[in-house]
């Protein structure tokens, strides 16, 4: 019985040697591109989702959680608002003459001096923030006939009643308050910012007690402007034990101009001026901590890297920042179209080319060759076509960043309640800009992705056509990215095809002869190999069944005896 089974096995092996796929006079050469098991989906102009081997995320969606103190000079407002620091609130004295690129206002900031309001708060805040300094110069104003340096228990500096350090509260001297008429020329070559105010007593009694006159008036003029303020006497909500208020105003005096102050009462006078500088300093409301790190881009959420062209962390930014978009993700293709390799290629592991799928594990190149010949199988990358594709894809990310990064800051915009319609319009414009940029970003990335995929497909086709031109009639295009070579082609021959030194004339006669011989016996169906192997397997199976049947019949008749020993 053992002899019969052994003979059957030998017979099947002999038949297998005569199948066309094992003919040593031919070889198979396939071309394909790199593939990965799990690619990345990107969007192109023609396809919402197409898989590529590699892609780079273009949207920065998270911050560091802290504001970096470099390269920008960050000034932490702590418990002080910028306006309180400007006026000289006692608990903000540490900010005198400070400079910054970005002033960070905290939600915990508070005022701790005489209650005040600023009718044009947003404009003053923006002006001082962009100036980037609280540098203050005292001037010798001549306030004759009045008492200076008024203070209040609502504004303590240590244990003493005090006032804003940059303002001078004037009130009557003995029982008189003369008309004040003071001028101050600007003989320097820069703009000067003067901060002044008007006191609004809570009662008529307080008005006459401080300023004698029942109604005061303050007029501040330059050659270009004039402001006249009449105090509004009356009670207001109590703040820090007071129902009176101070209104803060400001005047810019240009070089060569003159500041003129005229008043018969209620004047909160300036002590000097602030230097106004032009620059790109700014202010931001944020509760993010300030850390020791470096980042060009700052948002209220914290600093973010600017190595991506887009971000959706916050609309408010400072520095060289990615463009704000609504999308959470935009992926830029930096690899080729991905067609994962099929895990099984038939019973005998046939190879296939790029028409069917890519190849995994090709780490030394994007495009390459696989071959099957009398010496076995092998694989090699084509470095020239790989480098051609990489050279064109490299730099895509940098080019997109250059097109989109803002080299300026997007400041916070504030409006008073009376400017509500302007605020609504500004919000509409900002939202429209964001919508437009979000659409443009998606379109830009889709165009770049389309170009990348078309480019990598083109390099694959170029390599295939180059190989076809070398082989000519010595091989047949199998329609799946492979060539059936009709002559014996060892590894040296395969290498010459890869490096472009293959001479088809050397193998022409052998190839033509083999082509005609093989064509005479090959099936024309696309499933010829499958049919041959299935027929072979069925034949072997039937042969074994017949032999086993014969053995069982012989045993039953007593012609063969089987002994089973344990």
Curated annotation (Swiss-Prot):
Residues bearing a lipid moiety (S-palmitoyl cysteine): 555, 562, 565
Pfam name, any one: Hemagglutinin
Main location: virion
A GO molecular-function descriptor: host cell surface receptor binding
Disulfide bridge partners, by residue number: 30-482, 68-293, 80-92, 113-155, 297-321, 489-493
Quaternary context: Homotrimer of disulfide-linked HA1-HA2.
Protein's job: Binds to sialic acid-containing receptors on the cell surface, bringing about the attachment of the virus particle to the cell. This attachment induces virion internalization of about two third of the virus particles through clathrin-dependent endocytosis and about one third through a clathrin- and caveolin-independent pathway. Plays a major role in the determination of host range restriction and virulence. Class I viral fusion protein. Binds to sialic acid-containing receptors on the cell surface, bringing about the attachment of the virus particle to the cell. This attachment induces virion internalization either through clathrin-dependent endocytosis or through clathrin- and caveolin-independent pathway. Plays a major role in the determination of host range restriction and virulence. Class I viral fusion protein. Responsible for penetration of the virus into the cell cytoplasm by mediating the fusion of the membrane of the endocytosed virus particle with the endosomal membrane.
UniProt key word Signal: yes
Record topological domains on the Cytoplasmic side: 552-566
Subcellular location(s) of the protein: Virion membrane; Host apical cell membrane
Listed SUPFAM superfamilies: Influenza hemagglutinin (stalk), Viral protein domain
Record lineage: Viruses, Riboviria, Orthornavirae, Negarnaviricota, Polyploviricotina
Gene Ontology annotations for the cellular component aspect, listed alphabetically: host cell plasma membrane; membrane; viral envelope; virion membrane
Transmembrane segments: 531-551
Entries under InterPro entries matching the protein: Capsid_hemagglutn, Hemagglutn_HA1_a/b_dom_sf, Hemagglutn_influenz_A, Hemagglutn_influenz_A/B
Extracellular membrane side: 17-530
Recorded family membership: Belongs to the influenza viruses hemagglutinin family.
Post-translational modification summary for this protein: Palmitoylated.
UniProt entry keywords in alphabetical sequence: Clathrin- and caveolin-independent endocytosis of virus by host, Clathrin-mediated endocytosis of virus by host, Disulfide bond, Fusion of virus membrane with host endosomal membrane, Fusion of virus membrane with host membrane, Glycoprotein, Hemagglutinin, Host cell membrane, Host membrane, Host-virus interaction, Lipoprotein, Membrane, Palmitate, Signal, Transmembrane, Transmembrane helix, Viral attachment to host cell, Viral envelope protein, Viral penetration into host cytoplasm, Virion, Virus endocytosis by host, Virus entry into host cell
GO biological process, one term: virion attachment to host cell
Glycosylation sites recorded in the entry for this protein: 24, 38, 54, 79, 142, 181, 301, 499
Note: Major glycoprotein, comprises over 80% of the envelope proteins present in virus particle. The extent of infection into host organism is determined by HA. Influenza viruses bud from the apical surface of polarized epithelial cells (e.g. bronchial epithelial cells) into lumen of lungs and are therefore usually pneumotropic. The reason is that HA is cleaved by tryptase clara which is restricted to lungs. However, HAs of H5 and H7 pantropic avian viruses subtypes can be cleaved by furin and subtilisin-type enzymes, allowing the virus to grow in other organs than lungs.
Membrane topology: Single-pass type I membrane protein
Protein name: Hemagglutinin
Residues of the site described as Cleavage: 345-346
């Amino acid at each position: 019985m053992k002899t019969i089974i052994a003979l059957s096995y030998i017979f099947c092996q002999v038949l297998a040697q005569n199948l066309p796929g094992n003919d040593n006079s031919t070889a198979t050469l396939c071309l394909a591109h790199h593939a990965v098991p799990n690619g990345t989906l990107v969007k192109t102009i023609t396809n919402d989702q197409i898989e590529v081997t590699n892609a780079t995320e273009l949207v920065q969606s998270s911050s560091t959680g802290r504001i970096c103190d470099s390269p920008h000079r960050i000034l932490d407002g702590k418990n002080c608002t910028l306006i309180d620091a400007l006026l000289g609130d006692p608990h903000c004295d540490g900010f005198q003459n400070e400079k910054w690129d970005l002033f960070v206002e905290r939600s915990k900031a508070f005022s701790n001096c005489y209650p005040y309001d600023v009718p044009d708060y947003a404009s003053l805040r923006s002006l001082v923030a962009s100036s980037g300094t609280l540098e203050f110069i005292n001037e010798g104003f001549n306030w004759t006939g009045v008492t200076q340096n008024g203070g209040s228990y609502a504004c303590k500096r240590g244990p003493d009643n005090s006032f804003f350090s940059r303002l001078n509260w004037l009130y009557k001297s003995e029982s008189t308050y003369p008309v004040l008429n003071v001028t101050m020329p600007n003989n320097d070559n820069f703009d000067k910012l003067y901060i002044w105010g008007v006191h609004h007593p809570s009662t008529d009694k307080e008005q006459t007690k401080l300023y004698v006159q029942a109604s005061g008036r303050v007029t501040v003029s330059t050659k270009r402007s004039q402001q006249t303020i009449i105090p509004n006497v009356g009670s207001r909500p109590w703040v820090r034990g007071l129902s009176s208020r101070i209104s803060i105003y400001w005047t810019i005096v240009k070089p060569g101009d003159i500041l003129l102050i005229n008043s018969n009462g209620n004047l909160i006078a300036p002590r000097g001026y602030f230097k106004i500088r032009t620059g790109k300093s700014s202010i931001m409301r944020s509760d993010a901590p300030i850390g020791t790190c470096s980042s060009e881009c700052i948002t209220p959420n914290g600093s973010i890297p600017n190595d991506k062209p887009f971000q959706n962390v916050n609309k408010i930014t400072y520095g060289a920042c990615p463009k704000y978009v609504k999308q959470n993700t935009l992926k830029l293709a930096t690899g080729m179209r991905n067609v994962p390799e099929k895990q099984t290629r038939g019973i005998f592991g046939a190879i296939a080319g790029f028409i069917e799928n890519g190849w995994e594990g090709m780490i030394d190149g994007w495009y390459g060759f696989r071959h099957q010949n009398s010496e076995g199988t092998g694989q090699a990358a084509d470095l020239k076509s790989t480098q051609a594709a990489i050279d064109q894809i490299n730099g895509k990310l940098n080019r997109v960043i250059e097109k989109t990064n803002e080299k300026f800051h997007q400041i916070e915009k504030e409006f008073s309640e009376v400017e509500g319609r302007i605020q609504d319009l500004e919000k509409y414009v900002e939202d429209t800009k964001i919508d437009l940029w979000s659409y443009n970003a998606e379109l830009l990335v889709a165009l770049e992705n389309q170009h990348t995929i078309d480019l990598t497909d083109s390099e694959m086709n170029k390599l295939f056509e180059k190989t076809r031109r070398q082989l000519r009639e010595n091989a047949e295009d199998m329609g799946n990215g492979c060539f059936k070579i009709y002559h014996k082609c060892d590894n040296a021959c395969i290498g010459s095809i890869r490096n472009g030194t293959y001479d088809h004339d050397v193998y022409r006669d052998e190839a033509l002869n083999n082509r005609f011989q093989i064509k005479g016996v090959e099936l024309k169906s696309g499933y010829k190999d499958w049919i041959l192997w299935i027929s072979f397997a069925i034949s072997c199976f039937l042969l074994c069944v017949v032999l086993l049947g014969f053995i069982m019949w012989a045993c039953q008749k007593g012609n063969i005896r089987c002994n089973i020993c344990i």
